[in-house]
Protein backbone atom coordinates (compact mmCIF):
# COMPACT_ATOMS: atom_id res chain seq x y z
CA UNK A 1 0.00 0.00 0.00
CA UNK A 2 1.27 3.43 -0.83
CA UNK A 3 0.82 6.28 1.63
CA UNK A 4 1.44 9.97 1.07
CA UNK A 5 2.09 12.80 3.46
CA UNK A 6 -1.13 14.74 3.85
CA UNK A 7 -1.50 18.14 5.46
CA UNK A 8 -3.02 17.66 8.87
CA UNK A 9 -1.32 20.28 11.00
CA UNK A 10 -3.68 22.36 13.10
CA UNK A 11 -3.28 25.32 15.37
CA UNK A 12 -2.23 24.35 18.85
CA UNK A 13 -2.97 26.12 22.10
CA UNK A 14 0.34 25.05 23.52
CA UNK A 15 3.96 25.22 22.42
CA UNK A 16 5.00 21.86 21.02
CA UNK A 17 8.75 21.41 21.25
CA UNK A 18 10.16 20.58 17.81
CA UNK A 19 13.70 19.33 17.28
CA UNK A 20 15.63 20.67 15.55
CA UNK A 21 14.22 24.19 15.86
CA UNK A 22 14.59 24.74 12.09
CA UNK A 23 12.69 21.56 11.27
CA UNK A 24 10.09 23.43 9.18
CA UNK A 25 12.83 24.87 6.98
CA UNK A 26 14.51 21.50 6.60
CA UNK A 27 11.33 19.88 5.29
CA UNK A 28 10.43 22.95 3.14
CA UNK A 29 7.19 23.47 5.02
CA UNK A 30 7.24 27.16 4.07
CA UNK A 31 6.58 26.10 0.47
CA UNK A 32 3.54 24.17 1.62
CA UNK A 33 2.31 27.26 3.45
CA UNK A 34 2.77 29.31 0.28
CA UNK A 35 0.83 26.80 -1.80
CA UNK A 36 -1.95 26.72 0.76
CA UNK A 37 -2.20 30.49 0.89
CA UNK A 38 -2.54 30.51 -2.88
CA UNK A 39 -5.71 28.45 -2.50
CA UNK A 40 -7.21 30.72 0.16
CA UNK A 41 -10.08 32.96 -0.87
CA UNK A 42 -9.25 35.73 1.59
CA UNK A 43 -6.92 37.01 4.27
CA UNK A 44 -9.11 35.09 6.71
CA UNK A 45 -7.78 31.77 5.45
CA UNK A 46 -4.25 33.07 4.92
CA UNK A 47 -4.03 34.07 8.56
CA UNK A 48 -5.03 30.53 9.53
CA UNK A 49 -2.28 29.14 7.32
CA UNK A 50 0.27 31.45 8.93
CA UNK A 51 -0.91 30.48 12.41
CA UNK A 52 -1.00 26.71 11.94
CA UNK A 53 1.63 24.61 13.64
CA UNK A 54 2.53 21.06 14.50
CA UNK A 55 0.61 19.24 17.22
CA UNK A 56 0.74 15.85 18.88
CA UNK A 57 -2.96 15.98 19.74
CA UNK A 58 -4.36 13.00 17.81
CA UNK A 59 -7.96 14.12 18.31
CA UNK A 60 -7.28 17.51 16.74
CA UNK A 61 -5.39 15.95 13.87
CA UNK A 62 -8.20 13.49 13.16
CA UNK A 63 -10.78 16.29 13.29
CA UNK A 64 -8.74 18.27 10.75
CA UNK A 65 -8.47 15.20 8.53
CA UNK A 66 -12.22 14.60 8.72
CA UNK A 67 -12.85 18.23 7.78
CA UNK A 68 -10.59 17.91 4.75
CA UNK A 69 -12.13 14.58 3.77
CA UNK A 70 -15.68 15.95 4.00
CA UNK A 71 -14.81 19.06 2.03
CA UNK A 72 -13.27 16.98 -0.74
CA UNK A 73 -16.36 14.78 -0.79
CA UNK A 74 -18.54 17.87 -0.91
CA UNK A 75 -16.56 19.20 -3.89
CA UNK A 76 -17.26 15.95 -5.72
CA UNK A 77 -20.94 15.82 -4.80
CA UNK A 78 -22.13 19.39 -5.25
CA UNK A 79 -21.21 22.74 -6.73
CA UNK A 80 -23.56 25.00 -4.76
CA UNK A 81 -21.47 25.55 -1.64
CA UNK A 82 -21.17 29.35 -1.10
CA UNK A 83 -17.63 30.45 -1.98
CA UNK A 84 -18.17 34.11 -2.89
CA UNK A 85 -17.57 37.19 -0.77
CA UNK A 86 -15.05 35.88 1.76
CA UNK A 87 -14.27 39.43 2.86
CA UNK A 88 -12.13 40.04 5.92
CA UNK A 89 -14.16 42.56 7.89
CA UNK A 90 -12.69 41.79 11.31
CA UNK A 91 -10.79 45.05 11.82
CA UNK A 92 -13.68 47.17 10.55
CA UNK A 93 -16.11 45.43 12.87
CA UNK A 94 -13.81 45.64 15.89
CA UNK A 95 -13.23 49.34 15.22
CA UNK A 96 -16.89 50.22 15.72
CA UNK A 97 -16.86 49.05 19.33
CA UNK A 98 -16.03 52.70 20.05
CA UNK A 99 -19.10 54.92 20.32
CA UNK A 100 -19.26 57.63 17.67
CA UNK A 101 -17.45 55.60 15.00
CA UNK A 102 -19.23 54.36 11.92
CA UNK A 103 -18.76 51.96 9.04
CA UNK A 104 -18.15 53.50 5.63
CA UNK A 105 -20.32 52.84 2.60
CA UNK A 106 -17.94 50.29 1.06
CA UNK A 107 -17.50 48.52 4.41
CA UNK A 108 -21.25 48.10 4.81
CA UNK A 109 -21.44 46.69 1.28
CA UNK A 110 -18.71 44.13 2.04
CA UNK A 111 -20.36 43.35 5.38
CA UNK A 112 -23.67 42.66 3.66
CA UNK A 113 -22.17 40.31 1.09
CA UNK A 114 -20.00 38.43 3.58
CA UNK A 115 -22.90 38.03 6.03
CA UNK A 116 -24.91 36.61 3.14
CA UNK A 117 -22.10 34.09 2.63
CA UNK A 118 -22.13 33.22 6.35
CA UNK A 119 -25.88 32.61 6.21
CA UNK A 120 -25.51 30.52 3.05
CA UNK A 121 -22.79 28.34 4.59
CA UNK A 122 -24.81 27.80 7.77
CA UNK A 123 -27.86 26.78 5.71
CA UNK A 124 -25.76 24.46 3.55
CA UNK A 125 -24.02 22.72 6.46
CA UNK A 126 -27.33 22.25 8.28
CA UNK A 127 -28.62 20.02 5.50
CA UNK A 128 -29.55 16.58 6.77
CA UNK A 129 -31.33 13.40 5.69
CA UNK A 130 -34.75 12.23 6.87
CA UNK A 131 -33.19 10.75 10.00
CA UNK A 132 -31.56 14.02 10.97
CA UNK A 133 -28.04 12.97 9.98
CA UNK A 134 -26.06 15.90 8.65
CA UNK A 135 -24.56 15.54 5.18
CA UNK A 136 -21.17 16.76 6.40
CA UNK A 137 -21.20 16.32 10.20
CA UNK A 138 -17.67 17.48 11.00
CA UNK A 139 -18.07 20.59 8.88
CA UNK A 140 -21.49 21.13 10.43
CA UNK A 141 -19.80 21.41 13.83
CA UNK A 142 -18.18 24.64 12.59
CA UNK A 143 -21.60 26.30 12.55
CA UNK A 144 -22.30 25.66 16.22
CA UNK A 145 -22.90 28.99 17.93
CA UNK A 146 -22.64 30.92 14.64
CA UNK A 147 -25.44 33.42 14.20
CA UNK A 148 -26.82 34.83 10.97
CA UNK A 149 -28.12 38.37 10.73
CA UNK A 150 -31.17 38.61 8.45
CA UNK A 151 -32.35 41.87 10.05
CA UNK A 152 -29.01 43.57 9.40
CA UNK A 153 -28.98 42.32 5.82
CA UNK A 154 -32.51 43.64 5.27
CA UNK A 155 -31.57 47.02 6.70
CA UNK A 156 -28.50 47.22 4.48
CA UNK A 157 -30.71 46.48 1.48
CA UNK A 158 -32.85 49.46 2.47
CA UNK A 159 -29.77 51.68 2.59
CA UNK A 160 -27.59 50.48 -0.32
CA UNK A 161 -28.36 49.71 -3.94
CA UNK A 162 -27.03 46.62 -5.72
CA UNK A 163 -23.80 48.47 -6.50
CA UNK A 164 -23.15 49.33 -2.86
CA UNK A 165 -24.10 53.00 -3.15
CA UNK A 166 -26.37 54.88 -0.74
CA UNK A 167 -29.93 54.96 -2.07
CA UNK A 168 -31.90 58.20 -2.35
CA UNK A 169 -34.52 56.49 -0.20
CA UNK A 170 -32.08 55.68 2.61
CA UNK A 171 -33.73 58.58 4.48
CA UNK A 172 -36.40 61.19 3.64
CA UNK A 173 -33.86 63.96 4.30
CA UNK A 174 -31.35 62.47 1.84
CA UNK A 175 -34.07 62.08 -0.80
CA UNK A 176 -34.95 65.78 -0.44
CA UNK A 177 -31.31 66.93 -0.57
CA UNK A 178 -30.54 64.88 -3.67
CA UNK A 179 -33.70 66.15 -5.37
CA UNK A 180 -32.67 69.76 -4.70
CA UNK A 181 -29.13 69.00 -5.85
CA UNK A 182 -30.30 67.56 -9.16
CA UNK A 183 -32.47 70.62 -9.77
CA UNK A 184 -29.62 73.00 -8.92
CA UNK A 185 -27.15 71.14 -11.13
CA UNK A 186 -29.64 71.06 -13.97
CA UNK A 187 -30.23 74.80 -13.66
CA UNK A 188 -26.49 75.57 -13.68
CA UNK A 189 -25.94 73.27 -16.64
CA UNK A 190 -28.70 74.92 -18.68
CA UNK A 191 -27.40 78.40 -17.86
CA UNK A 192 -23.83 77.47 -18.75
CA UNK A 193 -24.85 75.95 -22.07
CA UNK A 194 -26.83 79.08 -22.88
CA UNK A 195 -23.80 81.29 -22.13
CA UNK A 196 -21.53 78.91 -24.02
CA UNK A 197 -23.72 78.86 -27.12
CA UNK A 198 -23.83 82.66 -27.13
CA UNK A 199 -20.04 82.80 -26.81
CA UNK A 200 -19.67 80.28 -29.63
CA UNK A 201 -21.98 82.34 -31.83
CA UNK A 202 -19.75 85.37 -31.21
CA UNK A 203 -16.64 83.34 -32.00
CA UNK A 204 -15.28 83.65 -28.48
CA UNK A 205 -15.19 79.89 -27.90
CA UNK A 206 -14.58 76.94 -30.24
CA UNK A 207 -17.64 75.00 -31.37
CA UNK A 208 -16.52 71.73 -29.74
CA UNK A 209 -16.03 73.21 -26.25
CA UNK A 210 -18.31 71.98 -23.43
CA UNK A 211 -18.63 72.98 -19.75
CA UNK A 212 -16.25 71.20 -17.41
CA UNK A 213 -15.63 70.80 -13.67
CA UNK A 214 -12.88 72.62 -11.77
CA UNK A 215 -12.72 72.29 -7.98
CA UNK A 216 -16.25 70.92 -8.03
CA UNK A 217 -17.66 73.92 -9.90
CA UNK A 218 -19.00 73.99 -13.47
CA UNK A 219 -16.94 76.37 -15.61
CA UNK A 220 -16.41 77.35 -19.25
CA UNK A 221 -13.02 76.70 -20.95
CA UNK A 222 -11.93 79.79 -22.91
CA UNK A 223 -8.79 81.24 -24.49
CA UNK A 224 -6.94 83.67 -22.13
CA UNK A 225 -7.34 86.54 -24.60
CA UNK A 226 -11.12 86.17 -24.45
CA UNK A 227 -11.55 85.76 -20.69
CA UNK A 228 -12.69 89.35 -20.15
CA UNK A 229 -15.44 88.91 -22.75
CA UNK A 230 -17.28 86.58 -20.34
CA UNK A 231 -18.06 88.11 -16.96
CA UNK A 232 -17.07 85.82 -14.16
CA UNK A 233 -14.34 84.36 -11.97
CA UNK A 234 -11.25 82.59 -13.32
CA UNK A 235 -10.76 79.38 -11.34
CA UNK A 236 -7.88 77.68 -13.10
CA UNK A 237 -5.83 77.46 -16.26
CA UNK A 238 -4.50 74.53 -18.26
CA UNK A 239 -0.93 73.31 -17.85
CA UNK A 240 -0.09 74.80 -21.27
CA UNK A 241 -1.60 78.18 -20.37
CA UNK A 242 -3.70 78.09 -23.54
CA UNK A 243 -7.01 77.69 -21.70
CA UNK A 244 -8.52 79.36 -18.65
CA UNK A 245 -11.62 78.15 -16.85
CA UNK A 246 -14.17 80.85 -16.12
CA UNK A 247 -17.18 80.56 -13.84
CA UNK A 248 -19.75 83.00 -15.29
CA UNK A 249 -21.25 85.47 -12.82
CA UNK A 250 -24.74 84.14 -13.60
CA UNK A 251 -23.93 80.73 -12.04
CA UNK A 252 -21.69 81.68 -9.10
CA UNK A 253 -24.56 81.81 -6.62
CA UNK A 254 -26.08 78.59 -7.98
CA UNK A 255 -22.70 76.85 -7.77
CA UNK A 256 -22.39 78.01 -4.16
CA UNK A 257 -25.79 76.47 -3.48
CA UNK A 258 -24.62 73.23 -5.05
CA UNK A 259 -21.60 73.14 -2.73
CA UNK A 260 -23.88 73.71 0.25
CA UNK A 261 -26.17 70.89 -0.86
CA UNK A 262 -23.20 68.58 -1.38
CA UNK A 263 -22.07 69.29 2.19
CA UNK A 264 -25.63 68.63 3.42
CA UNK A 265 -25.65 65.37 1.49
CA UNK A 266 -22.40 64.22 3.08
CA UNK A 267 -23.63 65.11 6.56
CA UNK A 268 -26.87 63.19 6.02
CA UNK A 269 -24.99 60.17 4.68
CA UNK A 270 -22.84 60.19 7.83
CA UNK A 271 -26.04 60.27 9.91
CA UNK A 272 -27.34 57.24 7.98
CA UNK A 273 -24.04 55.36 8.36
CA UNK A 274 -23.86 56.21 12.07
CA UNK A 275 -27.42 55.08 12.73
CA UNK A 276 -26.83 51.81 10.93
CA UNK A 277 -23.58 51.24 12.82
CA UNK A 278 -25.52 51.61 16.07
CA UNK A 279 -27.57 48.60 14.96
CA UNK A 280 -24.41 46.59 14.31
CA UNK A 281 -22.50 47.52 17.49
CA UNK A 282 -24.37 45.17 19.89
CA UNK A 283 -23.57 42.24 17.58
CA UNK A 284 -19.82 42.83 17.18
CA UNK A 285 -18.73 39.72 19.10
CA UNK A 286 -21.19 37.47 17.25
CA UNK A 287 -20.15 38.88 13.88
CA UNK A 288 -16.46 38.37 14.68
CA UNK A 289 -17.33 34.79 15.63
CA UNK A 290 -19.02 34.34 12.25
CA UNK A 291 -15.82 35.48 10.54
CA UNK A 292 -13.90 32.86 12.53
CA UNK A 293 -16.10 30.27 10.85
CA UNK A 294 -15.39 31.81 7.44
CA UNK A 295 -11.68 31.62 8.23
CA UNK A 296 -11.95 27.93 9.16
CA UNK A 297 -13.91 27.15 6.00
CA UNK A 298 -11.36 29.01 3.88
CA UNK A 299 -8.52 27.11 5.56
CA UNK A 300 -10.23 23.73 5.16
CA UNK A 301 -10.96 24.40 1.50
CA UNK A 302 -7.29 25.26 0.92
CA UNK A 303 -6.27 21.96 2.55
CA UNK A 304 -8.74 20.08 0.37
CA UNK A 305 -7.36 21.74 -2.76
CA UNK A 306 -3.80 20.94 -1.67
CA UNK A 307 -4.74 17.31 -1.00
CA UNK A 308 -6.27 17.15 -4.48
CA UNK A 309 -3.17 18.71 -6.02
CA UNK A 310 -0.79 16.25 -4.36
CA UNK A 311 -3.00 13.17 -4.62
CA UNK A 312 -3.05 12.92 -0.84
CA UNK A 313 -4.88 10.15 0.98
CA UNK A 314 -6.08 10.16 4.55
CA UNK A 315 -3.61 8.58 6.99
CA UNK A 316 -4.63 6.70 10.10
CA UNK A 317 -3.61 8.65 13.18
CA UNK A 318 -3.68 7.29 16.72
CA UNK A 319 -2.61 8.64 20.10
CA UNK A 320 0.04 5.93 20.34
CA UNK A 321 3.70 6.63 19.41
CA UNK A 322 3.57 4.68 16.15
CA UNK A 323 5.11 5.50 12.77
CA UNK A 324 4.35 3.19 9.86
CA UNK A 325 5.05 4.70 6.45
CA UNK A 326 5.11 2.61 3.30
CA UNK A 327 6.62 4.17 0.17
CA UNK A 328 5.94 7.61 1.65
CA UNK A 329 6.79 10.75 -0.28
CA UNK A 330 7.05 14.42 0.62
CA UNK A 331 3.87 16.11 -0.67
CA UNK A 332 5.84 18.68 -2.67
CA UNK A 333 7.19 15.81 -4.74
CA UNK A 334 3.65 14.99 -5.85
CA UNK A 335 3.20 18.28 -7.62
CA UNK A 336 2.41 18.17 -11.35
CA UNK A 337 5.36 17.79 -13.79
CA UNK A 338 7.53 20.87 -13.93
CA UNK A 339 6.63 21.89 -10.38
CA UNK A 340 8.55 19.22 -8.50
CA UNK A 341 11.96 17.63 -8.43
CA UNK A 342 12.95 13.98 -8.41
CA UNK A 343 10.91 11.82 -6.03
CA UNK A 344 12.61 9.96 -3.20
CA UNK A 345 10.21 7.37 -1.76
CA UNK A 346 10.98 6.02 1.68
CA UNK A 347 9.64 3.48 4.13
CA UNK A 348 9.74 3.73 7.88
CA UNK A 349 8.34 1.85 10.80
CA UNK A 350 8.70 2.60 14.48
CA UNK A 351 6.87 1.31 17.51
CA UNK A 352 7.04 2.37 21.13
CA UNK A 353 9.58 0.40 23.06
Residues covered by each model-derived region:
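Low-complexity, intrinsically disordered or signal/transmembrane-proximal segments
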Residues: 2-4
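Conserved amphipathic alpha-helical "coupling/scaffold" segments
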Residues: 6, 10-173, 177, 283-286, ...
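Gly/Lys-enriched N-terminal cap/neck module of very large, oligomeric protein machines
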Residues: 32, 207, 216, 220-237, ...
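Active-site phosphate-binding and catalytic loops of NTP-dependent enzymes
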Residues: 97-104, 126-131, 193-209, 302-313, ...
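Extended, charged coiled-coil "arm/hinge" scaffolds of SMC/Rad50-like chromosome-maintenance ATPases
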Residues: 148-164, 253-274
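Extended, Lys/Arg-enriched charged tracts that mediate electrostatic binding to polyanionic substrates
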Residues: 176-226
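Conserved NTPase motor "head" modules and their coupling/switch loops across ABC/AAA+ ATPases, GTPases
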Residues: 220-221, 289-353
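Non-transmembrane, heptad-repeat alpha-helical coiled-coil rod segments
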Residues: 262-296
Amino acid sequence: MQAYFVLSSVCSNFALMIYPSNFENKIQFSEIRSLLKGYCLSQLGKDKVDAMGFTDNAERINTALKQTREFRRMQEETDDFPLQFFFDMRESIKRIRIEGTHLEENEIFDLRRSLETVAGIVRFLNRSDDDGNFDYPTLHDLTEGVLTFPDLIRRIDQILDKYGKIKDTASPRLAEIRSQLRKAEGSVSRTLYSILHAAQSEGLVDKDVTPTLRDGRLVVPIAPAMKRRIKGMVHDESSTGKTVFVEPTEVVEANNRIRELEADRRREIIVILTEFTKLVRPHVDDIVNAYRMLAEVDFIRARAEFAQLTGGIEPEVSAKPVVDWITAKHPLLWLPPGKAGKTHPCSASAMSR
